[in-house]
A protein has these predicted regions:
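Short glycine-/acidic-enriched loop or helix-start segments at secondary-structure transitions
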Residues: 59, 67, 82-83, 103-104
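Structural motif
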Residues: 8, 46, 53-55, 62, ...
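A short glycine-rich, His/Asp/Glu-containing loop-to-beta-strand
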Residues: 2-37, 43-44
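Short, conserved beta-strand element in jelly-roll/cupin
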Residues: 25-29, 39-57, 94
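Residue-level recognition of specific faces of alpha-helices
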Residues: 20, 45-48, 103-106
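Ligand-binding loop in jelly-roll beta-barrel domains
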Residues: 19, 55, 75-101
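Double-stranded beta-helix
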Residues: 87-141
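Short acidic-glycine-tyrosine-enriched beta hairpin
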Residues: 60-78
């Protein structure tokens, strides 16, 4: 089990031996801190909710996904998730190619170091694994 702040990640399949797919279970407690919206330079992502309700956004579409519901994210598309509901949300996340469990271990170490996360280290780690933080929302003039 990999802890990233309040989130729990349990890898079921990591890329290797010719396999490009990564698959993990993601547990998101109610009202937990989650990663900021971001995109993956080269990874497709599929999220399938197993338990609870997960709010998931891909581009401009936001849905509250129930068990059995899914959303997919093409490479380069901004996406994010949250759990504003009263119960734990659990989802199966599939990436191709795999980002790798080591990414989550590194981010977990940065977040778990105490105090506010080191933004420079976090951005460097994200960049190394092909994650691109979304820019701030556009403002009306």
């Amino acid at each position: 089990m990999i802890r990233v702040g309040q989130l729990e990640i349990r890898y079921l399949q990591e890329a290797g031996n010719g396999c490009q797919i990564g698959c993990f279970e993601l547990r998101v407690p109610p009202a937990s801190n989650v990663p900021p919206p971001h995109s993956h330079a080269a990874n497709e992502e599929l999220v399938v909710v197993l338990e609870g309700t997960l709010r998931y956004t891909v581009g401009n579409e936001t849905r509250d996904l129930q068990p059995g519901d899914h959303m997919s994210t093409p490479p380069g598309t901004v996406h994010g998730f949250s759990n504003p509901h009263a119960v734990m949300a659990r989802a199966l996340v599939i990436n191709t190619p795999d980002i790798g469990a080591q990414y989550f271990r590194e981010v977990g170490a940065i977040i778990g170091a105490g105090g506010p996360p080191d933004r420079v280290k976090m951005m460097a780690t994200m960049q190394r694994y092909g994650l691109v933080p979304a820019g701030p929302p556009a403002t009306a003039n």
